[in-house]
Design a protein with these regions (language model features):
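Membrane-interface alpha helices of multi-pass inner-membrane proteins
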Residues: 41, 144-148, 182-197, 234-239, ...
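Membrane-proximal, lumen/periplasm-facing interface regions of secretory-pathway glyco-
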Residues: 342-404, 417-418, 432-435, 442, ...
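Short acidic/glycine- and proline-prone juxtamembrane loop motifs at membrane-interface regions
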Residues: 152-159
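Short hydrophobic alpha-helices at membrane interfaces in multi-pass membrane enzymes
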Residues: 173-190, 224-230, 299-306
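Short periplasmic/luminal acceptor-recognition loop of GT-C membrane glycosyltransferases, typified by
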Residues: 402-440, 467-473, 498
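Transmembrane-helix motifs of polytopic, lipid-linked glycan transferases
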Residues: 111-131
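Membrane-interface transmembrane helices that cradle and orient dolichyl/undecaprenyl
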Residues: 167-182, 287-293
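Transmembrane catalytic cores of multi-pass membrane glycosyltransferases
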Residues: 66-71, 197-295, 323, 329
Length: 502
C-alpha cells in the first residue's frame, strides 16, 4: 500500500480541508464529552473504587515515604516476615495516592483515580478518532472503558493506563508510517517503571510493533530497522532509572513465574466465561466480525491480538490489554478497508449542525466543562464523604481492639491486611504476596481454612504466638477457633475478633 495512503488520514486530508480546525475542535470536544461522561458515572459510584483491600496499604506506603524520605529494602509491616527483603517497587504510584490522601482524604484519592481514568478515555477517543469517525471513536472508547471497569481501583496500576494507551497508539502509528519511534517515548518507560510493575509490558508491545514494521518493509529499510532495534534495546535499559534498579524487574518476574499466591488471588485467576457473560459476548462478537468481514490485519497485528487475548484469558487482571489496546492496534486497517467509517471521509464532509455549534463555541464549551469539573470535585469533597468498604476496613473491630487494648500478634484474614498496615498494626498476611509470604506460607495459610485444616491452624497459633484473631465474617476457620477453645470477643456484619480461652 502506498506510503501516502498509509499516512494518518487526519493529517493527509488537512491540506485540502479548509474547515480542518473546526473539525478538530469538534473531534476534541467529542472526546472530552466521552471522558466527562465516564468520570460522571464513576463519581456516582465512587465508593466502588475503594473495594480493594490493597488500597489501604498502597496509600500507607506512600505516606511513610513522604514522612521518612527513604526507600524500604526490608519488610516493615508484618511480623511473620519482618526484616525479609521487600521493595516498594511501585513507589511513585504510592506517593501519588498518598499526596491525594493528604490533600483530601479518601475523597482526594478517588478524585485522582477518576481523573486518571477520564484521561485514559479521552486519549482512547483521541487516538481512535485520528482514523475513525469521532462518533464511532468515542463509542468504542466508552465501551472499552465500561468493559475494563473491574480494574478501576485505588491502586498504582490505574496511573499506567494513559501511558499504555499512548505507548501502543504511538508505536503502531510509527510502524504504520514506516518511521522510527520518537525518543521521548522512552521517558514513558521510565515513568511507567516507577509507577507499576507492569512496565515490562512495554517491552512486549514495543517488540510486536517492531514486528509489524518488519511485516510491512521486510529488510528493505535496514537503517529504519536498526533504529527500531536500538529503541527496543533501550527500553529495558531506561527502565533501570528506578530507585531499586534491576530489582524492580526481578520482582516482576517472581510474580509471573511460580508465585504460589497467584492461583489464590481473584484478579490473577483465569477468565471464567460463566462469570463474565458480557465480556465473553463481546469477544465472540469480535471474533465473528473478524471471520466474516473482509478486514485484513496481517500476521504481526494478529500476533498482537493473540498476545493480549492470551494474557486476559490467563489472568483476569489483564482484561485491559485486550479491550483497550486491540482497537488502537487495528484502527488503521478498519479505516482503510471501510472508508465509510474513516476520519478521512468525515473530514471531507460538511460539518453538521451539532459540529458547527461545537466548533463555533469551542472556547465557551471548554471553559464551561472546566468550571463543571472543578465544581463537581468541590461537591464530591464537601457533600459526599467517601470511605473504603467495611468489608476491608474492619473499622468496628479495630475500634474494639483499640478500646480493649488488645496486644500481641494478630492472625488476620487476607483482606484485613491492608487496613492493619494503614493503622500501624503488624500483619500475619497481607496483599504484598508478590514478594512476601512465600515458600509455602500462603499455601499453608489457605489450607488452614480447608475441612482438615484445624491441626495446621493450631500449629500456626503456637508457632507465631498469636494473641488475637481478626477474621472476616465468612472466614472458614471460625469453627476451628471455637473448637480450639477461643472465645468470640467481638462480631459484626463484616468482622469477628477471637481471643484465647482461659
Amino acid at each position: 500500500m502506498a506510503g501516502g495512503r498509509d499516512m494518518n488520514q487526519a493529517t493527509a486530508i488537512a491540506m485540502a480541508t479548509p474547515s480542518l480546525e473546526d473539525a478538530q475542535r469538534s473531534r476534541l470536544l467529542f472526546c472530552l464529552f466521552c471522558a466527562c461522561t465516564v468520570a460522571y458515572v464513576l463519581m456516582r459510584h465512587a465508593n466502588s473504587l475503594l473495594l480493594d483491600p490493597d488500597s489501604w496499604w498502597q496509600v500507607k506506603v506512600g505516606l511513610d515515604f513522604l514522612a521518612n524520605r527513604t526507600f524500604p529494602t526490608v519488610d516493615p509491616y508484618s511480623y511473620t516476615f519482618a526484616g525479609q527483603p521487600w521493595i516498594a517497587k511501585e513507589w511513585l504510584g504510592q506517593v501519588l495516592l498518598a499526596l491525594a490522601y493528604d490533600a483530601g482524604g479518601w475523597n482526594g484519592v478517588v478524585t485522582l483515580i477518576i481523573a486518571t481514568i477520564g484521561l485514559t478515555v479521552f486519549l482512547m477517543g483521541w487516538f481512535l478518532s485520528a482514523w475513525l469517525k469521532p462518533v464511532l471513536a468515542v463509542v468504542l472508547a466508552f465501551v472499552a472503558a465500561f468493559l475494563v471497569a473491574p480494574i478501576y481501583t485505588a491502586r498504582p496500576h490505574v496511573f499506567t493506563l494513559p501511558i499504555i494507551v499512548i505507548w501502543t497508539a504511538m508505536l503502531f502509528r510509527a510502524a504504520q508510517e514506516e518511521r522510527a519511534p520518537s525518543p521521548w517515548l522512552l521517558a514513558l518507560v521510565v515513568l511507567w517503571a516507577n509507577l507499576h510493575a507492569t512496565f515490562t509490558l512495554s517491552f512486549v508491545i514495543g517488540g510486536l510493533a517492531g514486528l509489524y514494521l518488519l511485516s510491512r518493509t521486510g529488510l528493505s529499510k535496514p537503517v529504519l530497522l536498526a533504529k527500531w532495534v536500538a529503541f527496543g534495546l533501550l527500553c529495558p535499559v531506561v527502565s533501570l532509572v528506578h530507585p531499586y534498579g534491576v530489582k524492580a524487574i526481578l520482582a516482576t518476574l517472581t510474580v509471573a513465574y511460580g508465585n504460589e499466591a497467584v492461583p489464590l488471588i481473584l484478579e490473577w485467576r483465569p477468565f471464567n466465561a460463566q462469570e463474565e457473560l458480557v465480556k465473553e459476548a463481546v469477544m465472540l462478537l469480535a471474533l465473528f466480525g473478524l471471520l466474516v468481514s473482509r478486514l485484513r490485519i496481517g500476521w504481526a497485528k494478529a500476533l498482537f491480538i493473540v498476545f493480549t487475548l492470551h494474557a486476559y484469558l490467563s489472568h483476569q487482571r489483564f482484561m485491559y490489554l485486550f479491550f483497550l489496546l486491540v482497537p488502537l492496534a487495528i484502527m488503521a486497517e478498519v479505516a482503510q478497508q471501510y472508508p465509510a467509517l474513516s476520519a478521512a471521509t468525515w473530514l471531507a464532509q460538511k460539518r453538521d449542525g451539532l459540529e458547527k455549534v461545537l466548533a463555533r463555541h469551542y472556547y465557551a464549551i471548554s471553559g464551561a466543562v472546566a468550571v463543571l469539573l472543578i465544581g463537581a470535585v468541590s461537591v464530591l469533597g464537601s457533600v459526599q464523604q467517601i470511605a473504603p468498604s467495611p468489608k476491608t476496613s474492619a473499622s468496628g473491630a479495630l475500634a474494639f481492639a483499640r478500646d480493649q487494648r488488645l496486644s500481641g500478634n494478630v492472625l488476620n484474614s487476607y483482606n484485613f491486611g491492608g487496613t492493619l498496615i494503614f493503622h500501624g498494626i503488624k500483619t500475619y498476611i497481607d496483599g504484598r504476596t508478590d514478594q512476601l509470604f512465600l515458600d509455602g506460607f500462603t499455601k499453608t495459610d489457605d489450607a488452614t481454612g480447608h475441612s482438615d485444616g484445624k491441626p495446621l491452624l493450631e500449629a500456626r497459633l503456637k508457632k507465631y504466638a498469636i494473641g488475637w484473631a481478626l477474621l472476616a465474617a465468612g472466614d472458614t476457620r471460625i469453627p476451628f477457633f471455637e473448637e480450639l477453645g477461643w472465645k468470640r470477643a467481638y462480631a459484626d456484619e463484616y468482622a469477628v475478633i477471637y481471643l484465647p480461652g482461659a
